[in-house]
Amino acid sequence: MAEQRLLGVDMGVSAVKLALLEGGAVVRTARVEAGRFQLSDLDELLQAGPEAIAVTGMGASRFDGAFRGLPVRQVPEFSAIGAGALALSGLERALVASVGTGTAFVMAARGEPARHLGGSGVGGGTLMGLMQRMGGEPDAERVAACAARGDLRAVDLCIGDLTDRDIPGLPPYTTVSNFARLGREASSDDLARGAVNLVCQTVGMMAVFAARAERVQDVVLIGTPVTLPVFQELIHMVEWLHPVRFHVPPLAPFATAAGAAFFALSPERESDIVQ
């Protein structure tokens, strides 16, 4: 493919992500809530003069053939996830956990087709839904701020609550059961931290099992939730217990959008793209 400037579009369930690729690098990004997205939202980035649009995601069917005179490439979502994660992380081979509304696990290696290994309904949507039901504010940054102040000991049952003996490989803070200690004394901050921890442990442990099966240690985390400091803090507790390395690349929320463009620029993969 001759194009060197592409606009990648990830039509997600919760949000639409845009990434402008030029000279092999992401130079601009934008995000629009899915419920508010209009095709006219592309106009600002289209002024940069991309030669084509690479679109992926659940809502990619909104683009058909050409748009504003530009060719539209339909890129398989798992291919976009793999290409974006590897390009932004600089890794040659890795398991990718795409944490969006739910979570998808993809095995990616340069020069090989991406493979979808499976997924989970637990993700960012779970976190927002739980917080709204608990009477909290379903806003990622506010949830993160609350969770940073919370105390897991007020909500989760840990090994240290059950025994004072040392258990090899399982330190006292290891969770036995999420929310099993939840009582009336737990604050909204404690609930927020417990909810984030539930998502982190589910994503983290599923990644551990998938990484073992694929015989890989590097796990790239992409999506908006993974950029929250409290998410990174809690998921790295999984890393301390298991032989995996979690990576959060720059522009992680836009990895799939960028990946659509990176994938479309790969000549050997053009046969997988719907024109």
Question: Where does each model-flagged region fall?
Answer:
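Short glycine-aspartate micro-motif
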Residues: 6-10, 52-55, 94-98, 119, ...
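Active-site rim beta-loop-alpha module in soluble metabolic enzymes
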Residues: 132-210
